[in-house]
Amino acid sequence: MSLTEKFDSVTVATKANVYFDGKCVSHGIVLADGTKKSVGVILPATLTFNTGAPEIMEGVAGSCRVRLKGESEWTVYGAGESFNVPANSSFDIEVAGEPYHYVCHFG
């Protein structure tokens, strides 16, 4: 997957989604074809996210360590790299130092 730098012709939710006392902030976007995504940033923290739909998390800047539900090993991801999370699952994410900027592709 190549690094997504911008989206054209989108609708943006102006109110941010704020999670974990502000450690993660994102905005939902809808593309012209109806595809939903979110763009956001995670500040230094270790957090656990639950998923409803399958997700592809694409790193835009910074780096993180990720552990998917049921796994014991952590994997490092940086800008231009992505990881897949199944529907109805969860993942732990650890960000240290620089914030981790991401695009979440749903479905």
UniProtKB/Swiss-Prot annotation:
Keywords attached to this entry: Glycosyltransferase, Transferase
Transferase recorded as keyword: yes
Role, per record: Catalyzes the phosphorolysis of diverse nucleosides, yielding D-ribose 1-phosphate and the respective free bases. Can use uridine, adenosine, guanosine, cytidine, thymidine, inosine and xanthosine as substrates. Also catalyzes the reverse reactions.
Entry's family note: Belongs to the nucleoside phosphorylase PpnP family.
Coiled coil: none
Enzyme superclass (EC): transferase
GO molecular function term, any single one: guanosine phosphorylase activity
Pfam families found in the cross-reference section: Ppnp
Cellular component annotations (GO), alphabetically ordered: cytosol
Protein name (record): Pyrimidine/purine nucleoside phosphorylase
InterPro entries: Ppnp, RmlC-like_jellyroll, RmlC_Cupin_sf
Species annotation: Aromatoleum aromaticum (strain DSM 19018 / LMG 30748 / EbN1) (Azoarcus sp. (strain EbN1))
Gene transcribed to yield this protein: ppnP
Organism superkingdom: Bacteria
Keyword Glycosyltransferase: yes
EC number: 2.4.2.1, 2.4.2.2
